[in-house]
A protein has these predicted regions:
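Acidic, turn-prone loop/beta-hairpin segments
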Residues: 212-229
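Long, non-coiled-coil amphipathic alpha-helical linker/lever segments
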Residues: 224-236, 240
């Protein structure tokens, strides 16, 4: 197998994350990554034998007996998806990324391995990594065998994409795991969106029909609490304040 010398970049990666030059949010995930780094980074294999890979994947250039490890080539989609290697103008427009949004189960690949690969290539690093938790269904892990998997497309078909976005931002803790139930979803949908926002829009629209209203073209100041929540990726707290 071929290996990437990740150990060479241990001190640099640790300093980047420790000083928030590469910001990892929330703090618990930052601590988790730093603990992993300080335990000692080992070089990792970037290829598999063709037999082990069951003949599936991208061959290592110059060595047809080896297949590139999925995580090694797959992470680069963040760049190739925005022009890297074929459209330099597009790549410079979108890279480096302001934020990577990832699940907590793949944090090491993004906050350690990917960063080491970019440092090795002399390429710009993403500015921050926001790590979210998992979503359960009715207090249980989603499972086909349990039949409790939530199909987001079914929810969107019935309620619309904005309603689902609202629920996920408002109800799911940004810095931890969350839970989805149709009961709670419909409760928020009716209370916050239909009755709250919906009634407000309906009443204002009715006034517009009968009265000539003038609006001041000024930015709405939502307060420092909302701003701070958004900067910390605490979308649930920000929406609660609004």
């Amino acid at each position: 197998n071929y290996f990437f010398r990740l150990s060479k970049y241990q001190e640099r990666i640790e300093k980047l994350i420790e000083t928030d030059e590469l910001r990892v949010v929330p703090q618990t995930r930052k601590n988790e990554v730093l603990s992993f780094i300080r335990s000692g980074l080992e070089d990792f294999s970037v290829s598999r034998s063709r037999e082990r890979a069951k003949n599936w994947g991208i061959p290592v250039p110059g060595d047809n007996s080896q297949i590139i490890y999925t995580w090694y080539d797959g992470l680069n989609i963040y760049q190739t998806g925005v022009g890297f290697g074929y459209d330099d103008k597009l790549w410079q427009k979108w890279w480096p990324a302001d934020v990577h949004v990832i699940g907590k189960g793949i944090i090491r690949f993004h906050a350690v391995y990917w960063i080491g690969m970019l440092l090795s290539a002399g390429l710009p690093l993403p500015k921050s990594i926001f790590v979210h938790g998992y979503i359960s269904s009715g207090g249980q892990k989603m499972s086909k065998s349990l039949g409790n998997v939530i199909d987001p497309f079914e929810v969107i078909k019935k309620y619309g994409s904005e309603a689902l976005r609202y629920y996920l931002l408002r109800e799911i803790p940004a810095h931890g795991d969350g839970d989805f139930t149709y009961g709670r979803f419909e409760q928020l949908y009716n209370a916050d969106l239909a009755n709250g926002l919906g009634n407000l829009v309906a009443r204002v629209a009715k006034l517009c029909d009968t009265s000539r209203l003038e609006f001041e073209n000024e930015k709405l100041n939502l307060g420092e609490g909302v701003k701070k929540s958004l900067e910390e990726f605490r979308f649930d707290s920000g929406l609660a304040e609004i």
